[in-house]
């Protein structure tokens, strides 16, 4: 991948501008091609710079009545050679730019999927998407119309300037004075582009977030008759992006005309003064024509350099946003070293999961768990119940190491989960979220997320385990039937059971279920309960439950309130001894 591999994380603060040096790691993989492009650029520049001298020779020989056929043939050959070199160079440059964008997108997407969960909590999805999409696209212009146009233009300017000095130092001085003043003024404006371009990309990210939010909640918006309000919200974000883009365009619009006026003014000066010098016999007509040709070879690259500079600044602004994400340490970057004895999870006949005086607070927030201690014996079913905000789902997240405990320890088979490699830990855990995501695509694709090499028979078996075998039978497409965006073609109960099937496919001995029956009707809830009963025989289950009816037969129930354990026992024991549990059960008509 054409992306940095050894850049230290956290090395690109958001507000610190980055320079061209930041591009080098991205271009390292394409170094060979870029060397070829550079060589072709030099050859093309040489072919172009030779043309005015040949033109002067043709004109001088015509004035002297001499033959010019051979010189004209060489001139035509140089023009054709320059065109061929330019075409090949541009193709290689575009291919390199596309490779750079591809490599950056792969790197960025892979890094996004490995960010700590806390980063997803605090960042907007749409903004992250815009960094993968629009920001990486701007890098293409950095390589093509930015970096290499600047280099090629500089070569042409140097060559043309040298030739102009040799032809007529006086005319070159006149040219330099006019062009230099104009370019200095234009460069002053061009320096503002990077900050403006970064601000424009930020506004695009906000607009993408607004669109993503509206589309993901399309049914709610439609049912609430809020289309007009949401449209205005998106339109407001779009107007801000439009305004930010206009600010960039205004600066670029100033730079372009300044370059044009500079070239035209220099051309008129050279014609006037040069014509007078031809009349005075100081130079020949051929010298003047060659000088004018070099003037355009000087002016056009200068204009390209100015345009390339603005493109480069826009691209560096986008690169800064990309680097900002890549500088965020991936999950596990700050893990404590894993002991050699902890590379495999031990399997001892002690409590499968143990919470030992666990304390936890979300980053930047207050503590949500306090001195939580209880054990989940191997092969049993334990339920976590309590009011909203009691910390039930947080406990599951700590087992999965989505977050790390602030105090105490979570242990699996006696080992602190922080001492275990995350992949090895999660291979032993099946996790089903409260809002179980079903990905757009087919039934098969959703199942294979956890175990991509699972056989057809294994897929059908796991569907049967959760009473979903009918999904593969009700369509001629079988397991390749489409489930729709977010599983919209499935019922709520089918989505939840599909998530459980996905978790079961890898055969984990521990299953973590976060309110699996939330928002289900009684029929789907009963089907899901049967599925849970079927898979509980061979596993340890830790279930967060809002509906107590789904866990009344659990081996133990842990009651949480305010981030603390207030009671542990069976349904019968807690109904008799714990006021909070009895209140919850009474509200759900489980006790009189």
Report the location of each language-model feature.
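ABC-type nucleotide-binding domain
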Residues: 5, 341-592
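Juxtamembrane helix-loop junctions of ABC transporter transmembrane domains
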Residues: 16, 39-40, 47-60, 78-125, ...
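Alpha-helical segments in transporter systems
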Residues: 21, 32-53, 57, 75, ...
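Transmembrane helices of ABC transporter permease
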Residues: 29, 33-43, 145-199, 270-284
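Transmembrane helix-loop-helix hairpins at lipid-water interfaces of multipass membrane proteins
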Residues: 31-85, 165-170, 280-285
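Helix-loop-helix
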Residues: 64-65, 163-177, 251-320, 325-329
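An intracellular "coupling" helix at the cytosolic face of ABC transporter transmembrane type-1 domains
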Residues: 117-118, 134-143, 147, 151, ...
